[in-house]
Amino acid sequence: MTTDFPAALRRGALLAALSPALAPAQAADPFNALAAVPPMAGLGTAPAPCQPADLARPLELSDVVDVALCSNPQTRLGWANARVQAAQVGVAQAAFLPTLGASASLSEVHSEATGGGARTQRRIGADLAYVLYDFGARAASLENARQLFAAAAATRDATVQNVFLAAVQAFFQRQGSVAALEASRQSEKAALESLNAAEARYRVGSATPADRLQARTAHAQAVLNRITAEGGVKAAEGALANVMGLEPTRPIALVPLPPASPGAGFEGDVTKLIETARAQRPDLAAAEAQYRAARAGIDAAQAAHLPTLSLGVGAARSQFAGQSAFDSSTIGLTVNIPLFSGYATTYKVRAAEAQAEAQAARREQVRLQVGLDVWNAYAALLTATQSVKSAADLLESATLSEAMAAGRYKAGVGSILDLLTAQTALATARQQRIQAGYNWYVARAALAQSMGALEGATLSEFGAVVPPHAPAASPPPAPSRTTP
């Protein structure tokens, strides 16, 4: 069989062109697109994946946050969505490489020229298609994919911040409910002592039946308050387990953290806080990336009606039964010029432009919401700081008043009504001091979250133990912007 040298040369050129693409075709991530999404990590395990938590010991606040970041389905969902968009970047990058296809066939050919007999034909071949130039369509699609990945990564970081705050809220809700239960038990004990004193005075004739009934009513109310507080503890335990990605029946022990006693108060320029928040809030970064993706979508839609230049290379070997095999090969350039698509391209461009306008409006909406979030959180923290001091003063005054009323009643110079009023005021003051103290923790965390800066350092302000090198939630690095 003679050799067609030009055909052999073309086949060699085909294999040479394909050889760089064949090796990474088997790789799991040839463009390192998925590598741009870091593994799920907790508060103090930035470089390493999440590790199983030790739930047998009492948990610090940082432990609760760490488990929540690693186990809450919301964080896993955000991580998976980021990987989806990272893979789409790889899909867009693949458009810059040639495509290779192979075919094989076995057929019977019937022809009158051969007396109607059947001949068996075998054929194998390979084809290469490579888009050389497309007026920026692939580049626009790649930019769109990269910006959508940036949006997904920023959305993941926003989710991390939200779960972080939810874990802080659940932690202090549980702490507050336990403290409220203890306060209700103290009030119940005081009400029982008052009831016993009223009963004793009634037996000796120095108290009226109304005094005894009032004391019984106050004690029954104290018992009811204690039962309600016990239910609040159960509800807080379930909420804490839920945010940690656990079953509500899972017992969780916490390291006690007393109510906050902040100093002079939080001082800060709210205007600068808003500016800082707009520079680092992940949801605003996501909105900006989605707008840029929409702008890239306009470029892609406009490039769809422009010509494309492609290279095509093919090689095949065919053989009829009983005959020698013969080779064939092709190489050529193809220019595809869209002439008319029924105005579909026109409306695709208009749709892309409208989408960009919508994303611009959404970006502005998020920008304004960021300012409002910071303003509300700032005001809430100022209020919480002042409430802690006022609640402490109220508790001190109510404690002295109750002690004086109890002493007067036991001495026989005070009325049961004065004592019960003082005890009710003390019970209310205890609850308000507890609530104000734990509300301050949540308000401080909420301000940090509103600025996109909720991190391990925030927990240090609460006196919580934070793992070393606990990082803030930061967007994963974007993939390289160089086209293949």
Region annotations inferred by a language model:
Residues 2-25:
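Gram-negative bacterial Sec-dependent N-terminal signal peptides
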Residues 3, 154, 158-276, 377-380, ...:
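Periplasmic alpha-helical coiled-coil/stalk elements that build and connect Gram-negative outer-membrane
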Residues 3-7, 26-36, 248, 432-484:
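Acidic, low-complexity, intrinsically disordered peripheral segments
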Residues 25-97, 248, 255-290, 339, ...:
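Bacterial Sec-pathway N-terminal export signals of envelope proteins
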Residues 58-60, 96-158, 268-276, 280, ...:
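Small/polar-residue-enriched beta-strand and adjacent coil segments characteristic
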Residues 77, 82-84, 89-91, 142-144, ...:
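Heptad-repeat amphipathic alpha-helical coiled-coil interaction surface used
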Residues 85, 92, 99, 152, ...:
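Hydrophobic stripe of amphipathic alpha-helices that form coiled-coil interfaces
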